[in-house]
Amino acid sequence: VQYGETDYDFLCRMAAEEGIFFYEEHAQKSTDQSLVLCDTVLYLPESFEIPWNPNTRTEVSTLCISQFRYSAQIRPSSVVTKDYTFKRPGWAGRFDQEGQHQDYQRTQYEVYDYPGRFKGAHGQNFARWQMDGWRNNAEVARGTSRSPEIWPGRRIVLTGHPQANLNREWQVVASELHGEQPQAVPGRRGSGTTLDNHFAVIPADRTWRPQPLLKPLVDGPQSAVVTGPAGEEIFCDEHGRVRVKFNWDRYNPSNQDSSCWIRVAQAWAGTGFGNLAIPRVGQEVIVDFLNGDPDQPIIMGRTYHQENRTPGSLPGTKTQMTIRSKTYKGSGFNELKFDDATGKEQVYIHAQKNMNTEVLNNRTTDVINNHAEKIGNNQAITVTNNQILNIGVNQIQTVGVNQVETVGSNQIIKVGSNQVEKVGIIRALTVGVAYQTTVGGIMNTSVALLQSSQVGLHKSLMVGMGYSVNVGNNVTFSVGKTMKENTGQTAVYSAGEHLELCCGKARLVLTKDGSIFLNGTHIHLEGESDVNGDAPVINWNCGATQPVPDAPVPKDLPPGMPDMRQF
C-alpha cells in the first residue's frame, strides 16, 4: 500500500524490498532514455578498461581515472527476519542470512527485523536482499575522472594502479558530473571546457542493492464503512474478513472491491469457540494497523452514528446492556438484554423464530416467586428416566379438549385427604388383568340412571358384617345354570303382596291374604317322623281348590329385563 509517500518514494521502497536496483540508459544516436530495472550484476553491460593516471594535466587527451580511494566500513554481518501470518499461526516465520566478504570486520553485528513483511518462503529472499542492502557500501572506492561513460549501471576495469589489488573489475553505483564552459571575455584568453566525474564503485563480484527504506507508519486508528456487493447485507470470506471504504478514499467505489480483506478482532477467539459478530455492510468500524503498518489493517471495534442508532432510546435506556442482532435481509431480530434500573432489574431474551437449549449434564432453575409459561401451539416433554413433580400447595390442571395418559408399567396415586373426580358424560376404565379398590373407611357409589356390570368369568363379593341392598322398584336375577344360597343361621324372604317360587309346572305361591298355593303335576309329602296338619275344615278331593293367582305385572320393568312370570 502506498501511504503517506510520493510515487517515487513508494517505487524506491518496493524496489529495495525486492532487491532491485535501477539506472538510466541514454541512446547513443538519439535522445531516447530508458529506465533499466535489474537484480544482479551479471546482466549489466560488458565492462570496459580505464587506466589510472593522476597527472591529468599532461595527458588530457586520454580518458583516465585521476583519483581513486578505496575504503572499508563496518556494516551489519547478519540479518534475522521474522513475521507472522494468521493463515499459518504455527509457522516459525524466521529466516537468517549471513553476510559475505567480511574480511575486515567482526561477525556479530546482527540486524533483527520484525515484522519482516513476508508471509511465506519468499522471506528468505527478503533476508538475502536486505543483507546485501545493509552491506552495499562495506567496501567502496571513490574516484574522479573526466570520462562521461562512468555512470551507474556500468562496469569498469581499473588498470595501471600502483596498488595491484585495485586493478580489478568494479561496478559503478554512483556518479556525479560537474562541467564548466566559461564564456571568453573579449581581449582575454579565458579557460577551456572541463568535465569532472565524481563516482563511487564497489567490487563487481557482488550485486549492489539499495538499503531497506523506512516504511511510512499510520499514526493511529481510522474510521471506515463496511462495503459489499449491491443488495448484500453481510459480505465476508471464510476467515470472517470484510472490506471497507476509508473516509479519505477518493477513488474506490463502495462495493466488494473497496479494499483488501481486513481481519476483525472479536471479544473471544479460540479453536472452534469464542465470540463471532461479522460487521455488516454500512456499519462504521474503527480500523487500526498492526505495528502501524498500512499493509496490515485490522478492525478493532465498531461505533454508532446518526443513521445507525443504538438499540433502545438513549439516554432513557442508559441502564440497559443489549446484544441485538438483525434478521438477514429482514426486519426481525434476536436479542439478549440486561436492565440494571433500580427495582426493575431484568434479563430479557427474544428469539425471532426458534430457540434451542442443550444441557449435557444438569440444569437447575430456581424461581423465588412466580413462574408463568405460555405456549401458543404444542409442547412436547421427553424424560428418559424419572420425573419428580413437587407442589407445595395446590395444582390446577385444565385440558380444553382431550387428554391421553399412558403409563408403561405401574402407576401409584396417593391422596392425603380427599379426591374428587367429575366426568361430564362418559368414563371408561379398561384393566387388562386385575383391578382392586381398597377403601379404609366408607365408599359410596351413586349412579343417576343405569349401572351395568359385566364379569367374564367369576365374581366374588365378601362383606365383613352386614350387606344391604335397597332397590326402589324391581330386581331381576338371571342365572344361566345353578344358583345357590347358603345362610349360616336364618334366612327370611318377605314380599308385601305376592311371593312365588316356580320350577317348570310346579308353583308355590304365597299371597298377602295368607293363602298358600301349591300346584304341580305330582305332589309328594314325606315326613321322616311325622306329617301333621291342623284346620277346622279339611277338604280333600272335593273340587274345592282355587286356581293359583298370577303375580302382579311390574309397571317399570326396564327394557330388556325378563318378565319372571313366564317361568
Model-derived regions, located:
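Acidic, low-complexity/disordered segments
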Residues: 163-224, 300-306, 310-321, 553-556
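Intrinsic-disorder/coil detector with helix-boundary
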Residues: 34-35, 44-48, 489-491, 497-567
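Short helix/loop capping segments that flank catalytic or ligand/cofactor-binding pockets
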Residues: 23, 45-48, 76-83, 89-95, ...
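Extended, domain-scale alpha-helical bundle/helix-rich regions
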Residues: 1-204
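Hydrophobic alpha-helical scaffolding
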Residues: 1-4, 67-74, 136-146, 212-216, ...
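Extended boundary segments
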Residues: 87-119, 207-250, 320
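Structural signature for extended repeat/solenoid scaffolds and their inter-repeat hinge/linker regions
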Residues: 20, 24, 29, 37-40, ...
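Glycine- and acidic
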Residues: 134-141, 158, 205-211, 227, ...
